[in-house]
Amino acid sequence: MVKDSDEIYMKRCLQLALMAEGNTFPNPMVGAVIVHRGKIIGEGYHHKAGLPHAEPNAIYSVKDQSLLKDSTLYVSLEPCSHYGKTPPCAKLIIDKQIPRVVIACLDPNPLVSGRGVKMLQEAGIEVKTGVLESEARRLNRRFITFQEKHRPYVILKWAQTADGFIDIAREDIGSGPIKISNGVTKTLNHQLRSTEGAIMVATRTALLDNPHLTTSKWSGNNPVRVVLDRRGIIPETNKIFDNRATTLVFTTKEGAEKHLIQRSNYLNQNKIKSIPETDKDLFFEKGNGIKKLFENDNIEYITIDFETNIVKQILDNLYHYNIQSVIIEGGSMWLNTVINSGLWDEARIETSKSIINTGIKAPFIDGIEIKSEIIGDNIIRILAPKK
């Protein structure tokens, strides 16, 4: 087949894969198409972790299985070669005697990482790789970053006025920020949350905005909520502690001790059972280990050193917590800290036409614009780091 037709069928694989966005964690999104003499005879995609992969879904969708011996299988990610929750896809392809396989990109997972291709080639199957590779890697940027860089994919996100401010200067706790996003972009922000592993804010944002950080405006999974609280000053009545989603608090030993007392009082009032005192002691001996302080509670505390490489410490902990992506929403100082660390992958900046003349300056970022979209009176720009 000519290159153009290979790309056409691979585009369809990517379209299929995207249908499961937000549902396949911790697995990547994968789509597969089977073509016989220029006609698509089978399609499939991976719906959810633990369910069949894209390749068997496509293979078993073919009504006349005898046609597989004269067909090409297109798949957006290298077929797996190991036994996990499902059997290896490479073995099924071999068993079905499919003579040609076209792959967009290799799987960076060490359990696969070229082994699927090798297995197919050793069985005499013609294998072609690298068709729409950059598009396929972009689709699974969270999974690939997690596997290759051993940290979550980091998305910076904020809304700013036309004159470069993200908010007015304010001190009233719970007063909420000025309105910059419009109704549509607010909904899209919640849609984004449903596709990412975690969402993070710093102490001041949690105090002043008192945000839920959930997907209340979109039907989907809530991300893990992450908050910085060095001194343990965020009250237990804050919405971020409402148990609607797992919440990780990065703090110090002193901050954790404060939360321990405050949380104990709060949960006892709400008749939630406290864990044994010995387990609480273990937490403090363990240092920066992730530990729940109470039974039936979704709040967990992680102690870190706030004086050294704070961004890396947080990302390392999120990696060990198996979080593949995180949205960092604020505040401006924390966003600038992450930007200056160089440990970010994407910035989503919404700009309105409003002008406020003074307030909290938006973060400074120097990146490459990869996409922009006008939504109502606002424009959303997506930036990537300069290489």
Could you describe each region identified by the protein language model?
Residues 23, 32, 51, 85, ...:
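Gly/Ser/Thr-rich helix-start
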Residues 105, 140, 170:
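Short, flexible helix/strand-to-coil boundary loops that buttress conserved ligand/catalytic motifs
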Residues 24-38:
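N-terminal glycine-rich anion-binding loops that anchor highly charged ligand groups
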Residues 34-136, 224, 255, 339:
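Zn2+-dependent cytidine deaminase-like catalytic core
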Residues 140-151:
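Flexible, polar/acidic helix-loop-strand segments at domain edges
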Residues 117, 133, 137-140, 186-193:
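Hydrophobic, well-ordered secondary-structure segments
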Residues 28-30, 132-135, 330:
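Short, conserved alpha-helical segments within structured domains
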Residues 2-27, 43, 62-63, 153-387:
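Enzymes that bind and transform nitrogen-containing heteroaromatic metabolites
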